[in-house]
């Protein structure tokens, strides 16, 4: 390869990445997922468009695995362990039982539609059987979904790859050897995938955490150390026949939920790397496909995609979540709809090509077509479905910027900056009147270009910039303190006519609003009553009905209900309440 060829590759690669980034601005305007746009850029630049010929499946496999490892590491870093209390076991059920059911139902339909053997059909089902972490993390971000739904989908997408890889590799081996029966040894292999992946991921994450916190390096080297360590854990786990995808996700989970040096620097770097990984991966996959090869299979492939989306996925979710009573029907319906397919099925579809199986190109084209339909249909309609099924909650107002204050190695102190607009509730209030969360401090107050020296009597004005020192767990309380009037109105429309303290006694609530206890202990706290009625771990947005009124969890403090909204039937709104 001469210098001219190398420079041409650099130029083409840079132009494709830049074009993907620039065109992605159309995503919000058109309501199309950004991943579809990036995929389209690759297809347009490929053999049927710009004429770039790329058919190196081994390179695509390499790029895909590298990109997914980075994306899962970033996803694990941003997943809070606290979300496991409501979603760990449901998500694992979806990641195992759910993938198996989806594989069988989709595979049987594929065998019938394309006149294939049952094993060949099941291979197609296994290839498209798992949801995709890149698609889920990308499309769920900032949608304001309740914690139970978000955590279930994210943990499922981060942990269901071992099952899909296991089924795909097993079925490829059966087709290559002519084997038609299953044996118990396969179950042991599956347990090995999960077991080794979990052990290496958690153990390797702990070792990497100790390295980051104990070694003094230049600030810019810590993110690189984390990425290198995560990739090493991914590769080592794969080398000893564990699930590298699960391991790197758990590694990120350990790092993201313990005090770690240069936390914000690591997160910022990983955010950029995860975006680059997604862009590179979907560009390569777009280049790899030949669009005109999809046309002959378009109608049966569309039928298979719709069968998977409308039948196989909903049935797998219904069975997978059957033991978990805390999930409402609308939450199950939304989880069923957000069975997003992305890069993982396309990468798994490369396996049969590399193994030289008959019909391997058909498997690849089918996987690509199903991913395209999933992203266009499910990804585009995600915000609309969330509102229709009422699984969204009002978001907490966020600061306009935040920065780490690394006063010691594992410092978790941060600086939050809030801009006070005309609609803020605190305008005109003196600083001493603000009920700041315990442990937070106002560090600075800017008015225009001037840094003020505030006292307790200083009043807040429109346009002020308020700098507050605190921790991440203070953000909900600070958000309420510096919220806007429209946001408060949204809170009350969502949570009800009044918002009560969670420790209010039922007897007092019943007397205040004229409700009947019907044998319920009057000394029971309202929060405990909601938990009993809800039959599971509560999250913000959970609702129960009592005495014809709707009671909604409004604020959580860890796993404890702090405030509860109450909505009365139209025209029967009585008495006072305690507002947020």
From Swiss-Prot:
One of its GO terms (cellular component) is plasma membrane. GO terms for molecular function: flavin adenine dinucleotide binding; potassium:proton antiporter activity. It is a multi-pass membrane protein. Keywords: Antiport, Cell inner membrane, Cell membrane, Ion transport, Membrane, Potassium, Potassium transport, Transmembrane, Transmembrane helix, Transport. It is found in: Cell inner membrane. One of its GO terms (biological process) is cell volume homeostasis. It catalyses: K(+)(in) + H(+)(out) = K(+)(out) + H(+)(in). The chain crosses the membrane at residues 6-26, 34-54, 57-77, 86-106, 108-128, 162-182, 189-209, 217-237, 240-260, 279-299, 302-322, 334-354, 366-386. Residues 402-484 form the RCK C-terminal domain. The keyword Cell inner membrane applies. The keyword Lipid biosynthesis does not apply. PANTHER family: K(+)_H(+) ANTIPORTER NHAP2, NA(+)/H(+) ANTIPORTER 1. K(+)/H(+) antiporter that extrudes potassium in exchange for external protons and maintains the internal concentration of potassium under toxic levels. Belongs to the monovalent cation:proton antiporter 1 (CPA1) transporter (TC 2.A.36) family. NhaP2 subfamily. This is K(+)/H(+) antiporter NhaP2. It comes from Pseudomonas syringae pv. syringae (strain B728a). The lineage of its organism: Bacteria, Pseudomonadati, Pseudomonadota, Gammaproteobacteria, Pseudomonadales.
